[in-house]
Amino acid sequence: MDLLIYIERGGIIVNILILMNIIGFAIMIWKSFVFFMTNRSIETLSNEILDELKLTQNYELAQIKSSISLKISSIESGLNTIKIIASLSPLIGLLGTVIGILNSFDSISHLGLGDPTVFSSGISIALITTVAGLIVAIPHYIGYNYFIGSLDKIEIKLEKVILDKI
């Protein structure tokens, strides 16, 4: 079957999943750029944090970690959206599954079991939405975990560079 036919048969559920996928991938592309630039500017970030610490004359480890956390939180923005897409898309696909099966049983109750295509049409929609939900969820789940791992590495690098400078 052609992809466009699957999208058409999946209805509003597949269209919602496509929109979520576009939004999620746009955020992941944006975050890839942000993480790339952040990794290249660890020295600059560490100097900014050290300048802030110099103003307060507070070089305690807790204050250093707090300042790093503030910088990291700005880099982290947008990752929750990726996590939400990874979590919600299988559920939305499951909603489509339930709707498809409901349509199948509704068709049977109106037309009987004489024509198997009536029943199979609803089941087909159910499976299309399930697959679409998983297709959206899996790369976003992988992307989210990759970014969280990268964020941890950036935080460790920042901490090391700052502690080396003090």
Mark where each language-model region is:
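Hydrophobic alpha-helical transmembrane segments of small proteolipidic membrane proteins, enriched
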Residues: 1-48, 52, 73-155, 160
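Acidic, Ser/Thr-rich low-complexity segments on the non-lumenal side of membrane proteins
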Residues: 55-80
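Cytosolic juxtamembrane regulatory segments of multi-pass membrane proteins
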Residues: 51-60, 163-166
